[in-house]
């Protein structure tokens, strides 16, 4: 029996014979992106993704990442050492296995004087930032997710519409969080889903949701993807722009930025102030997902 479909539009009867997968984390909201055509790049080339997948409705929050860290510490998959949050990466064709910084402590998630993780409740629902690519992958691996590929991210942001931003072609401070956008949290992140068409005290927001139901795909936090700049590059691609981005044009759905994830000499890891992420789960063998 389908206990609780993550997509509010999920037709449980339709998927009765499908396998139900428990994501093991209760508060990651996912929306379904069906296989099909979408518009890609500056020229709006029509491209195909021939499989269905789930993608995060929101960027991963400080609370979600904190919950991951505390659970992973207990399982010895995250280590707190010398005021650092460290994860292990299994390695790939380009990066050797080893220990890497998962995230530097900040005012949202920090390590206290007793070497215990702490969370700022005031920032619990803001996107986690300052996360390394390795930290984002560690979160995904822990819960059975992955980072989205650029194509998956862009389709979820734009659909089959030749538009510059997830909601259309124009941008102003009521649509997204960027540098000097004068939101109530300036000069920092806003809570995920903040731009939903409602007044927040005296600050008016437009509903900046994508056609698939994703929020904050422009501004707030840069989002790590699973794609390298090229096969031998230490740079991975980011999408969407961040709260400290001076040029909103770089928040357009087809824009790709690159971030170095490791150095050739110690320290081998690299984090960036405004880098966060959202998750993806590719659907295989007619799976659907539920959460508690």
Where are these regions (language model features)?
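A short glycine-rich, aromatic-capped structural motif
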Residues: 22-98, 130-134, 219
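C-terminal motif of bacterial Sec signal peptides marking the signal peptidase cleavage site
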Residues: 3-4
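Short, P/G- and charge-enriched loop/turn segments at secondary-structure junctions
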Residues: 18-20, 43-44, 257-269
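Residues within well-ordered beta-strands of beta-sheet-rich folds
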Residues: 32, 54-56, 137, 146, ...
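Short, structured beta-strand segments at or near domain termini in extracellular proteins/domains
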Residues: 273-289
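Core domains of carbohydrate- and sulfate-ester-processing enzymes
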Residues: 78-117, 174, 182
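Functional-site microenvironments in short loops/helix caps that host divalent-cation chemistry
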Residues: 112-260, 271-273
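N-terminal low-complexity, Pro/Thr/Ser-rich intrinsically disordered segments
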Residues: 12-25
